[in-house]
Amino acid sequence: MAAPISTVAESKELRGLNLIAAHSHIRGLGVDVDSLQPRPASQGLVGQEKARKAAAVILQMVKEGKIAGRAVLIAGPPSTGKTAIAMGMAQSLGPDVPFTMLAASEIFSMEMSKTEALTQAFRKSIGVRIKEESEIIEGEVVEIQIDRSVTGGNKQGKLTIKTTDMETIYDMGTKMIDSMTKERVMAGDIISIDKSSGKITKLGRSYARSRDYDAMGADVKFVQCPEGELQVRKEIVHTVSLHEIDVINSRSQGFLALFSGDTGEIRSEVRDQINVKVAEWKEEGKAEIIPGVLFIDEVHMLDIECYSYINRALEAELAPIVIMASNRGHSRIRGTTYNSPHGLPLDFLDRVVIVSTQHYSADEIRQILAIRAQEEEIDLSPDALALLTKIGQESNLRYASNIITTSHLLSQKRKAKEVSVDDVQRSYRLFYDPARSVKFVNQYEQRFIGDQGNVNFTASNGDAMEIS
C-alpha cells in the first residue's frame, strides 16, 4: 500500500520597509492636548519638559495658522534630544501640514546653488490646500451588459446602478468598459464614478451580497448601499506643496521630475507666476495657504551667504516656520573669521527664539534605554539596564543605545532569552566610546600618521631582523 502523501501549505509574508532608526520610537511630543503640559514620559519622549512645552506652543500656533516666517533655534549639548523634539513635532503635525527635514550639509552640491537648494526647501514647507467641486455617481452595481463587436470594433455597454431610493441605466463607451474591467467591477459592488475625469473607485461590496460566496478574501470590504440621489456633488480637497507646483510648471516632463528627483534649477519667473496664481486662488476662496515647518539640523554648518538668504526669506509673504538645531557654543561662522554664539551671525540671532535642552538625569537615561530596547524587541535584565544607564551617564546616550543591539547579538550567540550584564560588558570591551578612543590615541600617538604624513617607526616593538 502506497504511503499517504502529506502536503504542507507554505505562505510567505511580505514585509515592508520596517527598519529601526535612531528616532523610530517617537510618536509625538508627549504633551496634553488641552493644557499643553508635557507628560514625564509619553509617545517615546522622556524629560526635556521645558523644551517640549515650548515646541508644543509653537506647534499649536502652526496648526491654527497664526504664525509664519519665524525662526526657532533648539540649542543644547550633544545627546540631549534636539532632533528627537523635531521628530516629535513632525509626528504631531499630521499629514496635511508640510514638514521638511534636512541637514545643513545637504544644501552644498555641485549641481545646484546653495540659494536654490534653500529656496526649494522653503517652498516644500509651504502647502496649498486646493478645493474643487466634482460631480460623482455613487451606488451599487446591479448589472453590467457589454456588447462586443464581431469585427473587434468599439465596445458598447450598459451599466445599471442603484441607491436605496432610485435606479438608473447608463450607456458606457470603450474607455469606461476598459476601466470597469481593470477595476474588476461586478454586480454587487459599490462604486464611485467621477464624471469629469471618468475615474472609477471601488468602495467595497454591498451587505446585501455578503452571502453570495462561502469564502471571501481578506481584502473584501462590505459597505452599505448609498442613500438618496445617484449623482451628488462632493468637495474634494488636494494638499500640495509650492515646490511640487513649481516642478510641474518648470519642465517639459512635468510631474515626472517629482519621481526622478532631477528638478534642477527653477527660474524665478516661474515661481513669481505661481505666487500670483496662488494669491488669486486664495482671494477667490479656491485655495488656502498652509505655512509648514522647515527643520535644519546642524545649522552651524551653513555659511554666511546662507544666513543672509534665510534672513531675507523669513520676511517674504510665503514663509514657513524655520526650526534649527545646533550643539555648538561659541563657534566660528563658516565663511568668516568671526566667532559667535551657536555659530550663528548676531544679526540673525536677534530674529531667533531660542529653546535650550539640558542633560538627562540617570532615571531619564534608564527610561530612554528601556524604550529603545522595547522598540528593538530586546529583553534586558534589570542589572544589564542598570549597567547601560551607568554607561550612558559616563559616556553618552548614543553609545549606550548602540551597544544594546551588539549586546543582543552576543546574547543570541549563547541562545539566551535576555541580555545579561556579561553581554553588555563584552560589548563595552569590544566597542570603544569616544573617551576611551581619545585615551588610546593619546597613548599611542607616535604610532599614528600625523597631519604632515609623518610616523615614528622607532616607536614600534622592534625590528624582526634586529640582531642583538
From Swiss-Prot:
Keywords, in A-Z order: Activator, ATP-binding, Chromatin regulator, DNA damage, DNA repair, Helicase, Hydrolase, Nucleotide-binding, Nucleus, rRNA processing, Transcription, Transcription regulation
Catalytic activity: ATP + H2O = ADP + phosphate + H(+)
InterPro entries: AAA+_ATPase, P-loop_NTPase, RuvB-like, RuvB-like_C, RuvBL1/2_DNA/RNA_bd_dom, TIP49_P-loop
SMART domains: AAA
Major localization listed first in the record, in broad terms: nucleus
One GO cellular component, as annotated: NuA4 histone acetyltransferase complex
The enzyme's E.C. designation: 3.6.4.12
Family membership: Belongs to the RuvB family.
Subunit structure: May form heterododecamers with RVB1. Component of the SWR1 chromatin remodeling complex, the INO80 chromatin remodeling complex, and of the R2TP complex.
Protein name listed in UniProt: RuvB-like helicase 2
Lineage, opening ranks: Eukaryota, Fungi, Dikarya, Ascomycota, Pezizomycotina
Residues bound to ATP: G76, P77, P78, S79, T80, G81, K82, T83
Gene Ontology MF, one: ATP binding
